[in-house]
């Protein structure tokens, strides 16, 4: 029993075995053991799964870590019993042992030799202004992390199709993988797989590069003939824009810098087929965005907010995202994740508004909001920060008795500090194990204009933690942790 959690209420009803996970007939993804959870109707009952005694909480919830069923009996045998009653359930599942080894996998490959010109999602070619929400995702390998966020209409060289992915070349030194549906070519023909022949490419000419400033950002403006492939990389106090397959020469293409308190230095250089713009900043990177508008690539480097040390949150715009629906994890007694995350999110809103924050909610009802719409809401609100509220669950094969607690997630480096301050504030409020801060490629953490994090306050599949988050007092604790973490984060920007 965790003394930091509210007491689990007692339930003593008729025995009724209800398995929540795995779902009936589902394929169990683990190799030899897995968790099974649900409820039995009475906290006074004992429960065995395939002869293994598993714990039952006072509210009748159970969670067991048991061996997978053997190949010749693809089910769990559950027996719940009290002094006066017994209930049995044969619960069917599937395991790897039961379905046999996977057949060898051979990908479907189409190789182009020589490579051919391709346009990334050319349905956007008629537009002269790009939206940062409409990008093509690039990876270093078919299953790799997202590293490139390319403009629609970018011209690349198509090297091969592999199943639903396409390998394209940004310049002779850089191949990446994109979704095959994002690639449009005039002619597609299958040829035998050979090494692509080298082909002379026409470089995009950088016509002019200059800088400008506003109250919100310092902007790099690079005039080019068409949308180039690019990548933005960042350190703690520096940011670099690399334009692939470009050439900048002559006085007209030199960077015209400006004097600005955010910029320590600004340089332009050339490396092989690339034009590189590097900015050393006087303060840590807070946010940025990359646009292609009217023939100009814009890198906007966001200024950190002006913060009152006495009231660090006042005047900020913060987007609160109660995680899910349409999907979400479910606990042993049937509590669905979107229900308590909304309750916590609304409490976060109220606490933030009391501190002078303009709060934008991604949802205030049970109606589903698409995952991709949530960061769009935040960017269009010009948010100063984004926090998504979730409840965790283990993957098949992970023992939840060993792996549970509180953790936070980020994707871009400028969000790591926010993830840490929120975690530091949540752990004492919730009283659970500190799992740490994790780098992970999550959709709601990918925006670059503002720090964005996702909080997994607890594990809803743990019976005592599921019972706790049903209570208003524990929802309050989660909300306080989020708000205190946000306040600590913005206090670091106070002068």
Kindly label every feature range from the protein language model.
Residues 300-385, 395-398, 402-404, 494:
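Active-site histidine-acidic residue metal-binding/catalytic motifs
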Residues 33-37:
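A short beta-strand segment in extracellular, disulfide-stabilized domains
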Residues 2-31, 43-46, 53-319, 326, ...:
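Short linear recognition/processing motifs and adjacent strand/loop elements at protein termini
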Residues 385-388, 395, 407-410, 436-495:
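Active-site-adjacent mobile loop/cap segments within catalytic or ligand-binding domains
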Residues 75, 342-349, 372-375, 416-423, ...:
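Extracytoplasmic/secreted envelope proteins and their assembly/folding machinery
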Residues 140, 144, 150, 335-343, ...:
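Soluble non-cytosolic domains of exported or imported proteins
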Residues 325-327, 365-369, 391-397, 413-416, ...:
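Solvent-exposed loop/turn segments at secondary-structure junctions
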Residues 161, 346-357, 379-383, 414, ...:
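Sec-exported extracytoplasmic/periplasmic mature domains
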């Amino acid at each position: 029993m965790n003394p930091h959690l509210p007491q689990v209420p007692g339930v003593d009803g008729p025995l009724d075995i209800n398995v929540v996970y795995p779902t009936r007939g589902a394929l169990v993804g683990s190799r030899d053991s897995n968790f099974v959870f649900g409820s039995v109707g009475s906290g006074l009952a004992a429960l065995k799964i395939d002869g293994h005694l598993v714990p039952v909480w006072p509210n009748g919830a159970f969670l067991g870590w048991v061996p997978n069923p053997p190949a010749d009996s693809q089910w769990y045998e559950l027996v719940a019993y009290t002094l006066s009653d017994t209930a049995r359930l044969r619960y069917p599942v599937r395991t790897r042992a039961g379905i046999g080894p996977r057949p060898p996998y051979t990908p479907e490959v189409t190789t182009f030799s020589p490579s051919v010109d391709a346009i990334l999602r050319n349905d956007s070619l008629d537009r002269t202004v790009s939206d940062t929400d409409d990008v093509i995702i690039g990876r270093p390998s078919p299953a790799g992390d997202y590293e490139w966020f390319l403009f629609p209409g970018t011209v690349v060289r198509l090297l091969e199709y592999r199943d639903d992915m396409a390998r394209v070349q940004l310049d002779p030194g850089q191949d990446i993988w994109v979704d095959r549906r994002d690639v449009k070519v005039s002619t597609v023909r299958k040829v035998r797989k050979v090494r692509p022949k080298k082909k002379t490419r026409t470089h995009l000419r950088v016509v002019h590069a200059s800088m400008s400033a506003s109250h919100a950002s310092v902007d790099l403006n690079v005039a080019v003939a068409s949308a180039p492939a690019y990548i933005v990389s960042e350190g703690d106090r520096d940011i670099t824009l690399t334009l692939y397959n470009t050439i900048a020469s002559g006085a007209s293409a030199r960077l015209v810098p400006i004097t600005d308190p955010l910029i320590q230095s600004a340089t332009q250089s050339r490396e092989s087929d690339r034009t590189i713009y590097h900015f050393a900043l006087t303060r840590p990177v807070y946010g940025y965005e990359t646009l292609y508008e009217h023939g100009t690539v814009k890198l906007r480097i966001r200024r950190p907010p002006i913060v009152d040390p006495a009231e660090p949150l006042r005047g900020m715009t913060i987007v609160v995202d109660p995680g899910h629906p349409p999907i979400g994890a479910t606990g042993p007694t049937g509590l669905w994740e979107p229900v308590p995350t909304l309750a916590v999110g609304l409490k976060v809103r109220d606490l933030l508004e009391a501190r002078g924050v303009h709060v934008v909610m991604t949802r205030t009802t049970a109606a589903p909001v698409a995952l991709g719409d949530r960061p769009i809401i935040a960017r269009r609100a010009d948010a100063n920060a984004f926090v998504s509220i979730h409840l965790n669950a283990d993957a098949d094969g992970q023992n939840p008795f060993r792996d549970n607690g509180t953790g936070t997630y980020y994707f871009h480096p400028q969000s790591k500090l926010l993830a840490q301050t929120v975690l530091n504030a949540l752990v004492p409020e919730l009283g659970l194990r500190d799992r740490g801060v994790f780098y992970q490629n999550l959709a709601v953490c990918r925006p670059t204009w503002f720090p964005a994090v996702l909080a997994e306050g607890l594990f809803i599949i743990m019976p005592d933690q599921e019972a706790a988050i049903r209570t208003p007092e524990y929802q309050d604790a989660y909300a306080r942790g989020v708000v205190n973490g946000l306040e600590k984060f913005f206090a670091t920007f106070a002068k």
